[in-house]
Each structure stands twice: as C-alpha cells, then as structure tokens.
Amino acid sequence: MKRVYSKIESIAGNVITVTAQGIKYGELAIVKAKDTSSLAEVIKLDREKVSLQVYGGTRGVSTSDEIKFLGHTMQVSFSDNLLGRIFDGSGNPRDGGPSLDDNLIEIGGPSANPTKRIVPRNMIRTGLPMIDVFNTLVESQKLPIFSVSGEPYNELLVRIALQAEVDLIILGGMGLKHDDYLTFKDSLEKGGALSRTIFFVHTANDSVVESLTVPDISLSVAEKFALKGKKVLVLLTDMTNFADAMKEISITMEQVPSNRGYPGDLYSQLAYRYEKAIDFEGAGSITILAVTTMPGDDVTHPVPDNTGYITEGQYYLKGGRIEPFGSLSRLKQMVNSKTRDDHRTIMDTMIKLYASSKESVEKKAMGFNMTKWDEKLLKYSNMFESKMMDLSVNIPLEEALDLGWDILASCFSPKETGIKTDLIQKYWPKKETY
C-alpha cells in the first residue's frame, strides 16, 4: 500500500525527515516538489520519525511538499536486454535507450549462503603479464586496485574489460568525471566489448547520494547472471568516492564519527559489498575488482586500510604500472600450479632478480662503481619494465612465460638464474645472448 504524507519535519543537506507509520528500512518514496519530483530512500527509522535521503538533492524541496512511499525497496530490471546498456545509479537509462520495467528484482540483498560457495579454482586470463604471470586473478576473487589520483586506474579497468576472458562485464562508476565516463563508453564501443557490458554510472555532477546505490545495483544484477551460469566480472571505481558519500550522509545524520569522520560501520559496509564475490556450484561466478584511491598515497587511510582486511590481496598501481612488490593475489597458488609447470618458477625468479636490480639502480644513482653483475641487473630491469610491466602489453599467459625465458636468457646465464636443470633444459632458449 502506498502511503502519502504532506508535511516534512526537517530538511538537512540531502536528508528529509517526516512522521510516518508502517514504513520499513530501505523503502523508496517519491518526493514531489513544486516543479519536479525525486526518488528518496529510507535510511533511518526512529519510531515514527523517518529519515530519507533524496537522490536528486533537496534544492527546491519545501516542508509542505508531498512524500509518497512506494512500499518496496530499490528495484532494477533484470534480463538480457541490459547488455550493452548504460544506466545511472538508480537504474534509469543514461544512453537514451528505452526504460526497462519488466522482471524487477530488489537490490541489496544478503550475500549467498557460505554452504553454496565452492573453493576458487579457475584462473581469469586478462592478457596483462603483471596479473596473469605474477599475481593471477582467480574466479570469485575480490581484489582492490590501490592507487592515487592521476594514475591510469580507469584505463587499466578498460583494458581488463576488453581483454578478460569472462562472459559478462558489469562496470560500476562512482563519482566519475564526465571525460572518464566518455572514455569508458567510447573504448568499450571501439573494442567491441560493449555488447557484453552493463554500465551503471554516477558522475561527479550527479547527486552524491546516488553513488551509494551503484555497488549494490551492480552486484545484484551480477548475482542474477551468475545464477544463470555466467562468469561475471564486476569492475568498480572508485570505492573511496562511495565511502565519502557514506561519510557525508552520516555527518548529515549527526552520527558519531569514527576515524577521520567516516561512519563507524565503514568496515561492515565495505565487507557487505565485497562478500558478494562467489563461485556457485553448478552455476556461474562473481569476481570483483574495485579501484580504491588513497588520499595522499596513504595506505593507512580508513578506506584502503579497512579494505585490506576484507579482500584477498591487492594490486598496487604506481607510476602507471602494477607494482610487483606491493601487489599480492592470495589465491594465485590455487591456479598457477595448473597452468604450466614453469609458471611458479618464472614468477619467483623474475621477481627475485627484479628486487636485486633495485639495489643496482640505487648504486648507479649514487655514483658507485658498477660490477658486471650490476650491469646485467640493470639491463634486466629495463627489459622487465618495458616488456612485462607496461600496461600496453597484451599477450596470452603462455607467450608471457616464453617472454620471461627470453628476457632471462638475454641477461643471464642459466646458472645465474638459480632455476632447476630440468626446467632449463625444457624451456631455456637455444640461443643464449648473455
């Protein structure tokens, strides 16, 4: 039953308060102002005092305006017609296409029963050596991409969306600059991936509260497709904007702040979204990659700090590259023993030598004498960074492993690598150029 009220008790920021009965948490309402109407959601219940956040903002809203409660929580249409479409944070078309009102599903439900989950066991190939070789992305994994403003994290998401071997991409943007939104849209269209992509976007020009629904709507749709047997990759950017929106609402609601003004339930709110990652027995899966920008490159900032306790590793994007030392995929050992017998050896050896090369780079910068071993390490460092770490590199895993052997053979002798003899005999390039 729809209930209509015509008296607003208070207006604070994007939050209005009314006195109403029989209202449930999360229920939607329509706020009808003089010249417009806007969707609102119940975010707090205090007996008969009901607080709602207005998605379109409260500009132009007066205390005498009408509030019509709809009797249900946020819903979104679910069907194959979503593919190739672009929507806003409320599920309304943003691409000029028709509205979709059939087969509505509620968003923001609980995570799947743990007994329905299976142990992660399949690799997701991305064509990026720094992921596929060194920190393999595993189906049903949840990983953040830690970065700072100015790094090409959205460009990285575009490459993953274009190259990842999955059935479906769901892209959720929060606080996107309009140029970034157009970059996503144009790149996916040119790359031919828009037909397998669903885009839910909130731009920096939209009401800040609308960004709160983007992860929930993206993950709810992903779950339905996963239950239909689809391998779904959810790409979210930027979870710090999502947390900042929660912070703004909590301040408006005069809640007791926690670390740096964020709400006390920040960890729970983030975990609730990340725990949607799952591999269903006999069905599909949901894998989550979420950009999390770190203000001031501070990993102790509440958003990345809490995220690190929830997820199964992280990718660090620094200097336009995925940093090998800070990045970690905790589930990579579940799959990299099943790819090729030299995978783990190449991974360990190349990272070990690259770490050693950093000492040689410092020695050269400080003017110390360079040994022949230092010269080899410097050559190796340059080749590793240009051929492996560059984000423009797009090669299959097997070619990346072969490339690893070529780089090693170009810089070192077999003995200098410390690799076992049986693998040397099997994979070492015939022409040694060390």
Swiss-Prot record:
Keyword vocabulary terms for this entry: ATP synthesis, Hydrogen ion transport, Ion transport, Transport
UniProt GO MF annotations: ATP binding; proton-transporting ATP synthase activity, rotational mechanism
InterPro entries: ATP-synt_VA_C, ATPase_F1/V1/A1_a/bsu_N, ATPase_F1/V1/A1_a/bsu_nucl-bd, P-loop_NTPase, V-ATPase_su_B/beta
Cystines in this chain: none
Keyword Transport: yes
Residue ranges crossing the lipid bilayer per the database entry: none
Presence of the UniProt keyword Transmembrane in the record: no
Superkingdom of the source species: Bacteria
Gene3D superfamilies: 3.40.50.12240
GO biological process: proton motive force-driven plasma membrane ATP synthesis
Function: Produces ATP from ADP in the presence of a proton gradient across the membrane. The V-type beta chain is a regulatory subunit.
PANTHER family documented for this protein: V-TYPE PROTON ATPASE SUBUNIT B (PTHR43389:SF4)
Family: Belongs to the ATPase alpha/beta chains family.
Protein name: V-type ATP synthase beta chain
Provenance organism: Borreliella afzelii (strain PKo) (Borrelia afzelii)
